[in-house]
């Protein structure tokens, strides 16, 4: 329900902002070229703004406490492990943080390979063995090294542009059809047109989510493979086995869970950002 509400709120915000900007700037979206430019600005603009503030947003949303000076041997080990893996992967040392949560999870975020954050929950840090935690950390470092944040941002920008463009093209076709069958030729009217655009945004948005989730699952397999190289296949498999025994991940917002170790489970696998743990384990075992 929360995710549906956020989707509705986001689409309403896009429509409102788009209408205001078009009025102020006099943007003409009656032509395909003008509409495509408008769609790309909002589609890619929103995606890259989210990427630019991703570290700040993660820290605020999750209550992450960045480790600058280790307070105990566990925090020292955590920093040393990430530093070693980052060096192996050829990236700049990420910021390392801990957030309070009983669930076993971790995530990576940040606008670039050299400006990233790796965060682990207290539930994971103290509920797993060091070998298992090392596998999880290697998975997150691999996300950073593979450039997954930027890659998925570009994909998100493309599908956002498609949603905005396609919804308005179809709404225009519907408006022209209604106008041609209306004696007064008035078409849908402003409010009816906006309602049609909103519904189409939602429908195309679902299709876009399936596309983004597909690419996210591919990146998860790649991050698992990278973790196997950095920490050893047995440690990554052990971490996934441990996660499989635990409860479903639920507390992490969608924008962070896409790069987490343990994603939400769903009856519709098409909408999952992570492959089922069983498939990830099997993929590693057959490497």
Swiss-Prot record:
Any GO CC annotation of this UniProt entry: plasma membrane
UniProt-recorded Gene Ontology molecular function terms: metalloendopeptidase activity; zinc ion binding
Top enzyme category: hydrolase
Required cofactor(s): Zn(2+)
UniProt EC number: 3.4.24.-
Active site (record annotation): 140
Keyword terms, alphabetized: Cell inner membrane, Cell membrane, Hydrolase, Membrane, Metal-binding, Metalloprotease, Protease, Transmembrane, Transmembrane helix, Zinc
InterPro entries membership: HtpX_protease (IPR050083), Pept_M48_protease_HtpX (IPR022919), Peptidase_M48 (IPR001915)
Membrane topology: Multi-pass membrane protein
UniProt keyword Hydrolase present: yes
Keyword Transport among UniProt keywords: no
Biological process per Gene Ontology, one example term: proteolysis
Binding site for Zn(2+): 139, 143, 220
Segments passing through the bilayer: 4-24, 33-53, 154-174, 195-215
Subcellular location: Cell inner membrane
Cofactor note: Binds 1 zinc ion per subunit.
Record HAMAP family: Pept_M48_protease_HtpX (MF_00188)
Family to which this protein belongs: Belongs to the peptidase M48B family.
Protein's recorded name: Protease HtpX
Organism: Shewanella sp. (strain ANA-3)
């Amino acid at each position: 329900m929360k995710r549906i509400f956020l989707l509705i709120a986001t689409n309403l915000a896009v429509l409102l902002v788009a209408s205001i900007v078009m009025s102020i700037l006099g943007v003409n979206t009656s032509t395909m070229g003008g509409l495509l430019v408008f769609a790309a600005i909002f589609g890619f603009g929103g995606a890259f703004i989210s990427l630019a503030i991703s570290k700040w947003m993660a820290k605020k949303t999750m209550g992450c406490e960045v480790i600058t000076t280790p307070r105990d041997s566990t925090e020292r080990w955590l920093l040393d492990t990430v530093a070693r893996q980052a060096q192996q992967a050829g990236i700049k040392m990420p910021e390392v943080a801990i957030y309070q949560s009983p669930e076993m999870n971790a995530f990576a975020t940040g606008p670039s390979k050299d400006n990233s954050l790796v965060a682990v929950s207290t539930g994971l840090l103290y509920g797993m063995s060091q070998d298992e935690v090392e596998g999880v950390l290697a998975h997150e470092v691999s996300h950073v090294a593979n450039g997954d944040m930027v890659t998925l941002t570009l994909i998100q920008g493309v599908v956002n542009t498609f949603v905005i463009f396609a919804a308005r093209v179809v709404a225009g076709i519907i408006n022209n059809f209604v106008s041609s069958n209306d004696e007064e030729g008035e078409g849908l009217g402003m409010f009816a047109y906006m309602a049609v655009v909103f519904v189409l945004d939602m429908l195309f948005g679902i299709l876009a989510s399936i596309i983004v989730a597909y690419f996210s699952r591919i990146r998860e397999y790649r991050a698992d493979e990278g973790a196997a190289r950095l920490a050893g296949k047995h440690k990554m498999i052990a971490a996934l086995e441990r996660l499989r025994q635990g409860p479903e991940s639920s507390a992490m917002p969608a924008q962070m869970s896409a790069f987490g170790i343990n994603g939400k489970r769903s009856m519709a696998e098409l909408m999952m950002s992570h492959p089922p743990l069983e498939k990830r384990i099997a993929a590693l075992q057959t490497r």
